[in-house]
From Swiss-Prot:
SMART domains: HhH2, XPGI, XPGN
Protein name listed in UniProt: Flap endonuclease 1
Gene3D superfamilies, alphabetized: 5' to 3' exonuclease, C-terminal subdomain (1.10.150.20), 5'-nuclease (3.40.50.1010)
Biological process terms in GO annotation: DNA repair; DNA replication, removal of RNA primer
Residue ranges, annotated region (I-domain): 117-256
Keywords per UniProt: DNA damage, DNA repair, DNA replication, Endonuclease, Exonuclease, Hydrolase, Magnesium, Metal-binding, Nuclease
Binding residues for Mg(2+) 2: D174, D176, D235
Biological source species: Methanoregula boonei (strain DSM 21154 / JCM 14090 / 6A8)
Keyword check for Transmembrane: no
Region: N-domain, residue numbers: 1-99
Name of the top EC class for this enzyme: hydrolase
Amino acid sequence: MGVALRDILADYKTPVTWEGLSGVAAVDANNTLYQFLTIIRQPDGTPLMDAKGRVTSHLSGILFRMVNFLEKGIKPVFVFDGKPPELKQETNAERKKLRDEAGEKYKEAVERGDEEEAYRQARSATRVDETIIATSKELLDLLGIPYVQAPSEGEAQAAFMVQRGDARFAVSQDYDTLLFGAPLLMRNLTVSGKRKIRGRAVTVNPERLVLSEVLSGLSLTREQLVEVGILVGTDFNPGAAGVGAKTALKIVKSGGFAQKLAEKCPGFDPAPVADFFLKPPVTTEYELAWGHPCVEGIKKMLCDGYDFAPERVDAALERYSAKAGQKTLESFF
């Protein structure tokens, strides 16, 4: 997912504490749900499920991360992907193929008792489907957390909302949020402080990326940063073979973008991709209103509907009350 710019952005990542993260956060919903589905799993790689075999990893992730966000003074608004652009069709088709292949490899690993391989392939087979989206929105409604339906890419809409001042920062693991123009991007906002990287749990800290600092430090315009992304490869184009982020940066700064692209990707027109990053489809048709969480509704959905342990749900809801110094979750608002 996203664009591989890590190698040129390392110097511009600033560790931050949770205490400095208050304000409205435009959360890249699909990216966040994908994290929940890949990380919150059982030892054999299968996601958390209820007695009916329905996946619940994302619901657990939403509940506990949102509790944590609100405890820290973060007011989240989830931004869901809309219709994918035609530019993304090839990428989506390739991802589906890889997920299907991983699903078959998972079954083979289970049959031969290879738990480690089964876990790895199960994560690779993860998909955010319509049921995951619908149940996530249902829980967000009950929690009183607003969400926005983007016309296209959620990262683009989140970036736009920060540009407008409707959110303080965007939350996503994807660096293309910067290419879409997010002034402030936050990464690694996990409850546990850990992420799975190459199958291992590693400790991570919240980190901040400020677009103006990135552009100033790299001596680039945003248009040039997009060119770097196009050379490396994005969700909308495969990139130039053998060109990594550092090489792409040198090429763009030396004025060789068009020549290198013509050499490596003959016949490819970068203009539609650049235009999509610089002028993506976004909407102003949204309302940000945080409502009163429905305690009984949350319990009914999670405990009665999806077999969540009542004590876990109660403990999460009590954290709201402890934070507010009051007896009920509703009174927190």
